[in-house]
Amino acid sequence: MTPSEQNIDKEELAKFSDLAQDWWNPAGKMKPLHLINPVRLKYIEQQITLKGKHVLDVGCGGGLLSEALAKHGAIVTGVDMSESLIDVAKNHAEQQQLNINYQCQDIEILTKDAQRFDIITCMELLEHVPDPQRMIKNCAALIKPGGKLFFSTINRNFKAYLYTIVGAEYVFNLLPKGTHDYAQFIHPSELTQWAESGGLRLLDITGIHYHPLKNEFDLSRDVSVNYLACFTHE
């Protein structure tokens, strides 16, 4: 597969690759990801037991979620298109004595293999690829019947723009400026439609709410900004 055929935004890839060495610094540029990671794990564990499950973490970055899943008993494969992030993930997992199969790989290549997974996570990735529907379709092709797929992304509305771009990037400096492109945000209805066209069935959508005074995230019924969705393939 040539680079032009891959579902990759080269500018987005370079942007996150540049953050590789700061990925595991909880007080650094990836601080919001460190804060949100326990909430993502909490949501996944509400939907399915992790122990002994084969999990594919798509767009694993430096391995924050992959390590959390592994520590809770999952057998984890993490894939990302950034070599520098995969190197960081491998080195950190080795330091933690965790056995995680990290690959610098396009998910479309994985669909040609025989392995299928009990759980697939695709967190904070859909809004950073040129064709999110294609990404969802490839995830659907890799899940076992009855398996669970988890996506997290950002709703597209004025409130989400204010919170995630104006607030997070420019007012509170929680994220590097330019992290998000509003045009790439995704309505829950769009996500559901794309997933259903790939043979998936929606089980749950839950919001993620940021408490600025507590400086922490939690699950919420409000899906107007950040949200998580769980699907199954039957």
From Swiss-Prot:
What's this protein's function? O-methyltransferase that catalyzes the 2 O-methylation steps in the ubiquinone biosynthetic pathway.
**Gene that this sequence comes from:** ubiG
- Which terms under GO biological process does the entry name? methylation
The protein's Enzyme Commission number: 2.1.1.222, 2.1.1.64
Q: Which CDD domains match?
A: AdoMet_MTases
Q: Which organism is it from?
A: Coxiella burnetii (strain Dugway 5J108-111)
- Give yes or no: UniProt keyword rRNA-binding: no
Q: Pathway it acts in?
A: Cofactor biosynthesis; ubiquinone biosynthesis
- Entry protein name: Ubiquinone biosynthesis O-methyltransferase
Q: What class of enzyme is it?
A: transferase
